[in-house]
Amino acid sequence: MGWSLGGLLSTFVASQIKVNKLILVAASPCLINNTDWEFGIESHVFNQFVNNLKNDSTKSLKRFVSLQSKDKSQIQELHQSIQKFPASQSALDSGLQIILNSDLRDTFKNISTSKKCILGSLDTLVPVKIQDWYEAAGSKTHVLRSGHLPFLDNDFKI
C-alpha cells in the first residue's frame, strides 16, 4: 500500500516481487503532467512548491497540510508533527526527484495482481479524473469526498 509518493514506491515494488494486492491512496503512476498525461501536477506548480520547500520547508509543509483538510484539530495535530519531526533537506530533495522523474504508467498496467486505488474527489494533486485511466488499466477504484489526505476522512477504509 502506498500514499502519494509512496504509491510510486509501492507500484515499483509490486512490479518486482509477488504481492497479494496493490492498494494506492491518492497516488498516480506519474505525478507531473506532460504532453500525454493530464492526471498530475502542472510542472510550474511543482517547481514553485520545490522552491518554497527550499526556502522554508516547515512553513511549506504546514501550508500544504492546511489545504488538505477542513478539520482544524487534524490540521493542528499535523502541524505539531511537522514541527516535532522535521524532514531533512536531503530526504525532501530525494522525494522531489522521485516525483519529478518517475513515470510508472506502463509498469502499473503490467502488474497482474489485484489493484485498488482510493481517490479523493477534492484532491488537487491527483485529480479524480484519473479514475477512468485506473479502471482501464485493470484497477478497482473508490472515491471519497476528500482531498489529498483521504485517510483523514471518517469514511476511509481499506
Language-model-detected regions and their locations in the chain:
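Short beta-strand/loop motif that positions the catalytic acidic residue
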Residues: 110-112, 117-123
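Short beta-strand immediately N-terminal to the catalytic nucleophile in serine-hydrolase-like folds
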Residues: 1-2, 25, 118
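Gly/Ala-rich beta-loop-alpha elbow adjacent to hydrolase catalytic centers
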Residues: 1-10
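Catalytic histidine-centered segment of alpha/beta-hydrolase-like enzymes
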Residues: 125-126, 143-158
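Conserved beta-strand scaffold positions in the cores of enzyme catalytic domains, especially
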Residues: 115-117, 140-143
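Flexible "cap/lid" loop of the alpha/beta hydrolase fold
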Residues: 16-52, 89-94
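Active-site-adjacent alpha-helix of alpha/beta-hydrolase-fold enzymes
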Residues: 132-139
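Conserved alpha/beta-hydrolase catalytic His-Asp/Glu region
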Residues: 55-102, 107
